[in-house]
Amino acid sequence: MIIDITEIMDWIPHRYPFLLVDRVLKIDPNKSITGIKNVTVNEPQFTGHFPARPVMPGVLMVEAMAQLAAILVAKSLGSTKNKEVFLMTIENAKFRRIVQPGDTMHIHAVIDQQRANVWKFSSTVTVEGEIAAESKFTAMIKDKT
């Protein structure tokens, strides 16, 4: 099931310039999700990171993983209209390859565990088949107040 950017914005609250998932390529609710982020030189982070050699910040790769996982949570629950997804922990984040404008980040997230409102994930970002980043993280799903 492919989910385009318009539908992604129905499932998570992020917007430009902080929406870091362009398309969902595959989703298996309650299990895993795969999506992409096309990295372009027009993104605001590249004005300072770094002007002479733009490099995608590692924290934004982790954020892209978390946003993709939030889409998986929303699809698994059927809706998150009355809920919010908050990142609780980031563990073992590793950055193995530079990501730069022109690259397509292929992001994959897997649910490792889900208990009540706490969800644990493993995620990777690959570019041209090489692992660029990997991380484990935990998110909490809370009712909106």
UniProtKB/Swiss-Prot annotation:
Q: Which protein family is it in? A: Belongs to the thioester dehydratase family. FabZ subfamily.
- NCBIfam families, sorted: fabZ, PRK00006.1
Enzyme class, first EC level, given as a word: lyase
Q: Supply one GO molecular-function term.
A: (3R)-hydroxyacyl-[acyl-carrier-protein] dehydratase activity
Task: Report what the protein is called.
Answer: 3-hydroxyacyl-[acyl-carrier-protein] dehydratase FabZ
- What broad class describes the main subcellular location of this protein? cytoplasm
Q: What is one process in the GO biological process aspect for this record?
A: lipid A biosynthetic process
Keywords assigned by UniProt, alphabetized: Cytoplasm, Lipid A biosynthesis, Lipid biosynthesis, Lipid metabolism, Lyase
Q: Name one Pfam family in it.
A: FabA
Q: Which GO terms describe its cellular component?
A: cytoplasm; membrane
**Where does the record locate the signal sequence feature?**
none
Q: Give the species.
A: Rickettsia rickettsii (strain Sheila Smith)
Q: Where in the cell is it found?
A: Cytoplasm
Underlying gene: fabZ
Q: What is the documented function of this protein?
A: Involved in unsaturated fatty acids biosynthesis. Catalyzes the dehydration of short chain beta-hydroxyacyl-ACPs and long chain saturated and unsaturated beta-hydroxyacyl-ACPs.
Q: Which residues does the entry assign to the active site, renumbered to this chain?
A: H49
Provide the catalytic activity annotation: a (3R)-hydroxyacyl-[ACP] = a (2E)-enoyl-[ACP] + H2O
Q: Which EC number applies?
A: 4.2.1.59
